[in-house]
Amino acid sequence: MTRLFKALLFSLLLALGVAGCGSVTVSAYQDQKPALDLRTYFNGTIDAWGMFQGRDGEVARRFKVVMDAKWTGDTGVLDEAFEWNDGTTSRRVWTLKRQPDGSYRGTADDVVGEAIGEVAGNAFHWRYVMALPVDGKVYHVDFDDWMFLMDDRVMLNRAAMSKWGVHLGDITLSFTKR
């Protein structure tokens, strides 16, 4: 390896490391109100409206979701029925489990492994890999998902999608509890 290449590689790795250190953690929202309790908010029927924007910001798809959610102890089932702007429908059923340390783990049929999340203040942050079908192929895409409770009925959600560290787009949702 040449010295120039080594220097460039070191600079790139250093820049990536510094960028990773600047990430916001959920604890930054510890004092924000109203305090979010997933078991309280995700209980009953919730309506949501959302959109997917590609990395250029253009809205590529819009959707409505009706979620039926219920908890038994520390285990919650969130049954989501999607209606997309092209008339297609889909369904995702999440199973969430509150852990002894207060964190959450979640599974769904199209989630690879487990989603892992934490709550602090009015915020819920979780990460997971989703198997997304696109044009007959399935891609494993990373989700960095943030939810913020605005009041007892409204929650806002933004998820950044990436593959191999490359930003693919964002999903934005507004939840309204009935």
Tell what function each PLM region has.
Residues 144-178:
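Glycine-rich, aromatic-bearing surface loops/beta-hairpins
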Residues 49, 53-134:
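Central antiparallel beta-sheet cores of small beta-barrel/beta-sandwich binding domains
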Residues 29-45:
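N-terminal helix-cap/turn-to-beta initiation motif at the start of protein domains
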Residues 17-20:
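C-terminal motif of bacterial Sec signal peptides marking the signal peptidase cleavage site
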Residues 27, 65, 71, 145, ...:
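Sequence-level preference for short, compositionally simple segments enriched
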Residues 1-9:
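Bacterial N-terminal signal peptides that target proteins for export
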Residues 22-25:
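Bacterial signal peptide processing site
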Residues 59-65, 138-143, 167-169:
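Amphipathic hydrophobic-ligand
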